[in-house]
Amino acid sequence: MKLLNAALLGLFIASTAFTSFSDEKKTATAEHLQNVSVTIRSEGSFSNGEGSGVVFTRKDSKGNLVNFVWTAAHVIDNLRKERKAVINGSPKTIVEFKDPMVVKEIRQGGRTVGRLQMDAEVLKYSDADDGHDLALLRIRKFNFVKDTVTFHLGDEIPNLGDDLLHVGSLLGQMGANSMTDGIYSQHGRLIKSLNKHVFDQTTCTAFPGSSGGGVYKKGNAHYIGMLVRGAGEGFNLIVPVRRMKDYCEEHKIMWALDPKVEMPSEAELKKMPIENTPKEKEDSDAEKEAAKKLFPYMLRVTYPKVLIMKEMKQND
């Protein structure tokens, strides 16, 4: 009897220890994903956009922490401007971007205790309609955060049914990120109306403000894709990290995903084109508008009060 009681006690202690470990891991994962997640705010001339992003941190040659941010291109497309210039006697179209704002909320003891916000420059941009819907930013201040995301860079594709987590800025709540869970419900979705790009599918709940937010494997918190569009509860589309790898390899920026790849110098970064020559458009404008209705962006859009007041006066 004593042996049985001792055995039962041992099982209870082991079970409690396992549960505690699981809870600790869950808490650590949630804290880590909160630390690498940010809100992206874009203040354009006619509208403001609010979405999400994830921080990838590198060290430069001087030991400074350089914080890069991946987000969806459609989150910042209202900041894009073109101007004409004559360079060496030839007319050129110059593409420029106003700085988006990266917002990070500081929480302690279960409550918000402050907020950090920094300007970021746009380093790379591949538009949503005819490109990959990806944007790479660099926060202008060194050492903004020390945390960094880990990308799933292996060749294996996660299995259908794998547990996933998504972190995004609910309704653009400016730095306080919400976490949802779901499963990997499908991969390799080839959607003609979305320029025949491959998307993966998840049941993780998304909301306006989720665009650009990371989707992660629940077991190790590795980033497996970026949430960009939704078509109803339980049906959301992500740009898989393997597509991001293809884009980075094509444009020689694997250093923005893989910490083992040497980071370019400041001079080399300045020479890097923000946009590369887009491929020939395959879809009509009507098809693109239809796609936006079927699979809308998970972006929160607001309008400046001045613009609203002007429209109201015009309608009087």
Where are these regions (language model features)?
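Bacterial N-terminal signal peptides
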Residues: 7-16
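Flexible, gly/ser-rich surface segments that form the specificity/activation loops bordering the active-site cleft
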Residues: 23-28, 124-128, 146-198, 205-211, ...
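C-terminal cap/linker of serine protease catalytic domains
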Residues: 24-28, 80-106, 171-172, 223-316
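A conserved glycine-rich beta-strand in the N-terminal activation segment of trypsin-fold
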Residues: 25-26, 37-70, 179, 212
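Conserved hydrophobic positions within beta-strands
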Residues: 53-55, 122, 184
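Catalytic nucleophile loop of clan PA
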Residues: 54-55, 205-227
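Catalytic-histidine neighborhood of serine endopeptidases
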Residues: 58-127, 242
